[in-house]
Design a protein with these regions (language model features):
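Conserved ABC ATPase "signature" region
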Residues: 107-127, 179-180
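Conserved ABC transporter NBD signature motif
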Residues: 60-72
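ABC-type ATPase nucleotide-binding domains, specifically the catalytic core motifs of the NBD
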Residues: 14-15, 89, 93-110, 121-122
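Helix-to-loop junction immediately C-terminal to a conserved catalytic motif
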Residues: 52
């Protein structure tokens, strides 16, 4: 059994008969970096919220490491696009909040040192510890939002368009940071990453899944070896990469045309 198992999953909101997701089946192995693509409104974020335990399936089942995915858990780190920092707390205090849940017996000094180390791990200086979110740039806020999710060392990381609101330069830096954090670990985390951006998926993922229009199910997926995954510098030079890029775009747009017609 994989790290994440989705069986015959369907979902509708509040008793609404209109399904958002229909008959989703997916097995994600430990250490995979899976990117989910699809048009706006197809249910990508809804699927992530279901995996996070923030919503419950209408029918079907979700298992995380063999256990039903009901409610929040320290085994799942979740990062959203809107930073998710408490504005009245300093950056370091936001991280401490997560650390105290994971390590309730550690003393304050040890927890603070861990929080500083997590800030440094996401490319921020120790001085950021004492800054409030309003004092930080968008890129710094998002790094701070990723730090609490990583600080509790969850085996599974769920990310919902975490870089979608950032400028191109900051986005590229954080993409590289995330990939380096994921690929540099002896025991790689399982990452489930929602994005609209085909190029972002190609840069980060070793598996890409495309959802169709609502009611969504999986209409296409592919795996990328380390050799197939492009670098930022070579992504437009590799013919196979460009073929795959065009196919992903075709699959997404094909389903839109089908629903319009």
């Amino acid at each position: 059994m994989g790290d994440i198992t989705v069986k015959n999953l369907s979902f509708s909101y509040g008793g609404d008969e209109r399904l958002i997701l229909k008959d989703i089946n997916m097995e994600i192995e430990a250490g995979e970096f899976v990117c989910i693509l699809g048009q706006s409104g197809c249910g990508k974020s809804t699927l992530l919220r279901l995996l996070a335990g923030l919503e419950q399936p209408t029918t079907g089942e979700i298992l995380m490491q063999g256990v039903s995915a009901e409610g929040a858990s320290l085994d799942k780190g979740v990062v959203f696009q809107d930073y998710g920092l408490f504005p009245w707390m300093k950056a370091g205090e936001n991280i401490l909040l997560a650390l105290r849940q994971r390590f309730p017996k550690k003393d304050k000094k040890e927890l603070k040192q861990t929080a500083v180390e997590m800030l440094e791990a996401v490319g921020l200086s120790a001085s950021v510890y004492n800054k409030f979110p309003k004092e930080l740039s968008g890129g710094m806020k998002q790094r701070c939002a990723i730090a609490p999710a990583l600080s509790v060392d969850p085996p599974i990381l769920l990310m919902d368009e975490p870089f979608g609101a950032l400028d191109a330069v900051t986005r590229a830096r954080l993409q590289d940071m995330l990939f380096d954090l994921w690929s540099g670990q002896a025991s790689q985390k399982t990452v489930f990453f929602v994005t609209h951006d085909v190029d972002e998926a190609l840069l980060l993922a070793n598996r890409i899944v495309v959802l169709g229009q609502s009611p969504s199910n999986i209409i296409y997926e592919c795996k990328l070896s380390d050799e197939q995954r492009p670098t930022r510098e070579t992504r437009f030079d590799n013919l196979e990469t460009m073929k795959l890029r065009n196919e992903l775009i075709r699959q997404i747009n094909k389903d839109v045309v089908t629903h319009i017609s």
